[in-house]
UniProtKB/Swiss-Prot annotation:
Organism: Caenorhabditis elegans
Entry's Gene Ontology molecular function annotations: identical protein binding; manganese ion binding; metalloaminopeptidase activity; peptidase activity
Protein name: Leucine aminopeptidase 1
Function recorded in the entry: Probably acts as a digestive enzyme.
InterPro entries per record: Leucine_aapep/pepB, NPEPL1_N, Peptidase_M17_C
Active site, renumbered: K264, R338
Enzyme Commission no: 3.4.11.1
Length: 491
C-alpha cells in the first residue's frame, strides 16, 4: 500500500528507483538556488545551477515539464487566479500530476514542494489525492513510498505531522467513496466509523435497524429499511469539559442509491456507490481534527443507509414521521438524502446540544448547475459562517460557493396538503432545486434558529472521472483548525 509522508525540509529517500517531482509557483521557484540538499536530490536530473536558472527563466508560468526521460518532472503552479478560484491554484497540481505514469520499477516518488506558508496545505492535499488507495485489480496495487518534502521557512514539525495525517484523511475519504456497496455495506461503514472512534478515543454511539424506529428516526429507518443490511446512525463524540463551542459534523452515508421505487436509469445509477461521500468526508475531517488537540466539543454524526427496492421500501404517497416529530409526504423516493440528514441535524441540535451544525452530502445533481464541478454549494443562516467557509475553501483547495438562503421565499415549494411537507417538488418551483433540498433539512431545526447551521452540497466535487476526490477533510480542518494545536491552522 502506498504511504504518503510529509516532511519539513528536503531529506533523503529510500533505496530503489526514485522519481523526482519539483513543484512550486514560478514566483517561488525563481528564488530557489541550486545548492545544498536540493542540489543533492536534483543533480541527477539537472546538471548544474546554470542549467536550473536557465530552465526556470524559460519555462511557462504553469504546466508540467518532463526532465531526464520523464524520471523527473517540474510542475509550475500559476501565480494568478480569478476571484472565484483559490489563490493557491491547487487544482492545477492535481491536473498535472494525475496523468503521470511512474516507471514500472519505481520505488520512491520524491516531491520537493517549494511553497509559501498559506499555500502549503492545499498543495499537499492536491498531491496526496492523486495516490488512490482502492483497487481490486488482480495485478495488485503498486506500493510506493511517497515523500512530500516541503521547503518553507515557516513550516513547523507539528505542521508536517498534521499534513501527513491530513493526507491520509483525504485518501481515506476517497477510498471509502471508491469502494463498491457489495463491500462497503451499511455494516461495513459502521465498522469504519467505529475504527475511527477507537483510534481517536471517542465516545461511540450506534443506533441500528429496528432500534432506529423505536427511537423515532423515521427518516433514516424508512429510507434504509429496504436495504440488504440495516440502516444505522453513528455518533462519534470528542467531549471537552467547559467547551464554549459544541460542533456537529453530519454526513450523508447512502452506501448505494438505486433511487428506490422511483428507480434510477441504466445511465443514472452507475457510480451511486459514491452517495456516501458526505459521511466519508465528515468522518475523516473529524479524525484529522481530533488527532490534533481539538479544544472544543466535536461530534461526527453519520446517517448510514442503502436506498434499495423491496416490498417494504418507501413508496410515493407514503407519509412518515421524522425524529423532529414533523410529518413528510414522500413524492420522490430518490430524494432520500434529505430525509436521513433531517434526522441527523435534529439529533445534533436536540440531543447533542450543538451550537454549530454542519451537514455535508452528495445531495443533488442540480448542484453542478449551481456551482460547477469544482465548488461545493453552501447554504447557511449565518452570513459570517458563509464568508468563513468560502475563505476556508480557497485556503484548502476544497472550493465553496454560496447558494441562496431564503426559506421565507422558497420553502413553500415543498407544501403538502396532507402532511407538514413533501420531500421534493416535482413541478415548477420558485427556488433553486439544490437550495430547496437544503431547506428541507433545515426545516427540522427551525432553519437554524438559535444556532449556526450550514448545509454543503458536494454532489459534483466529491468525484472526478471514475474516482473520489477526498473532498472535505482539508476544508473542515482549515475552517475549524483554530481549535487545534497546529500552527498552520491558526494563521
Amino acid at each position: 500500500m502506498t504511504q504518503v509522508l510529509v516532511r519539513n525540509g528536503i531529506q533523503a529517500v529510500g533505496d530503489g528507483l526514485t522519481s523526482l517531482i519539483i513543484v512550486g509557483k514560478k514566483s517561488v521557484l525563481k528564488n530557489v538556488t541550486f545548492e545544498g540538499k536540493f542540489k543533492e536530490v536534483a543533480q541527477k536530473f539537472v546538471t548544474d545551477g546554470d542549467s536550473w536558472n536557465s530552465m526556470i527563466s524559460r519555462i511557462p508560468a504553469s504546466g508540467r515539464h518532463p526532465l531526464h526521460y520523464e524520471l523527473a518532472h517540474l510542475i509550475t503552479v500559476p501565480d494568478a487566479s480569478s476571484r472565484g478560484n483559490t489563490p493557491t491554484n491547487a487544482h492545477s497540481i492535481y491536473k498535472e500530476l494525475k496523468p503521470i505514469n511512474y516507471p514500472e520499477d519505481t520505488k520512491n516518488v520524491h516531491f520537493v514542494l517549494f511553497a509559501e506558508y498559506p499555500d502549503v496545505l492545499s498543495h499537499v492535499a492536491a498531491i496526496a489525492r492523486t495516490f488512490c488507495k482502492f483497487s481490486m485489480k488482480t495485478s495488485g496495487i503498486r506500493e510506493l513510498n511517497v515523500n512530500i518534502d516541503v521547503v518553507c521557512d515557516k513550516l513547523t514539525n507539528e505542521d508536517a505531522v498534521f499534513l501527513t495525517d491530513l493526507s491520509e484523511s483525504v485518501r481515506e475519504t476517497a477510498r471509502l467513496i471508491d469502494t463498491p456497496a457489495n463491500i462497503l455495506t451499511t455494516d461495513a461503514l459502521v465498522d469504519e466509523a467505529v475504527k475511527v472512534g477507537n483510534a481517536t478515543g471517542s465516545k461511540i454511539t450506534v443506533i441500528r435497524g429496528e432500534e432506529l424506529l423505536k427511537a423515532g428516526f423515521g427518516g433514516i429507518y424508512h429510507v434504509g429499511k429496504a436495504g440488504p443490511t440495516p440502516p444505522a446512525f453513528v455518533v462519534l463524540s470528542h467531549e471537552v469539559p467547559g467547551s464554549t463551542e459544541h460542533i456537529a459534523l453530519v454526513g450523508k452515508g447512502v452506501v448505494y442509491d438505486t433511487g428506490g421505487l422511483q428507480i434510477k436509469t441504466k445511465t443514472g445509477m452507475p457510480n451511486m456507490k459514491r452517495d456516501m461521500g458526505g459521511a466519508a468526508g465528515m468522518l475523516e475531517a473529524y479524525s484529522a481534527l481530533v488527532k490534533h488537540g481539538f479544544s472544543q466539543t466535536l461530534h461526527a454524526c453519520l446517517c448510514i443507509v442503502e436506498n434499495n427496492v423491496s416490498p417494504i421500501a418507501n413508496k410515493p404517497d407514503d407519509i412518515i414521521k421524522m425524529l423532529s416529530g414533523k410529518t413528510v409526504e414522500i413524492n420522490n423516493t430518490d430524494a432520500e438524502g434529505r430525509l436521513i440528514l433531517a434526522d441527523g441535524v435534529f439529533y445534533a441540535k436536540e440531543t447533542l446540544k450543538a451550537t454549530t451544525i454542519f451537514d455535508m452530502a452528495t445531495l443533488t445533481g442540480a448542484q453542478a448547475w449551481l456551482s460547477g464541478r469544482l465548488h461545493g454549494a453552501a447554504m447557511t443562516n449565518d452570513e459570517q459562517l458563509e464568508n468563513e467557509i468560502i475563505k476556508a475553501g480557497k485556503a484548502s483547495g476544497d472550493l465553496v460557493a454560496p447558494m441562496l438562503f431564503a426559506p421565507d421565499l422558497f420553502f413553500g415549494d415543498l407544501k403538502s396538503s396532507i402532511a407538514d411537507m413533501k420531500n421534493s417538488n416535482l413541478g415548477k418551483m420558485d427556488g433553486p432545486p439544490s437550495a430547496v433540498a437544503g431547506l428541507f433539512i433545515g426545516a427540522h431545526i427551525g432553519f437554524g434558529e438559535g444556532l449556526r447551521w450550514l448545509h454543503l452540497d458536494i454532489a459534483a466535487p466529491a468525484e472526478v472521472g471514475d474516482r473520489g476526490t477526498g473532498y472535505g477533510p482539508a476544508l473542515f480542518s482549515t475552517l475549524l483548525g483554530k481549535y487545534t494545536s497546529v500552527p498552520m491552522l491558526k494563521q
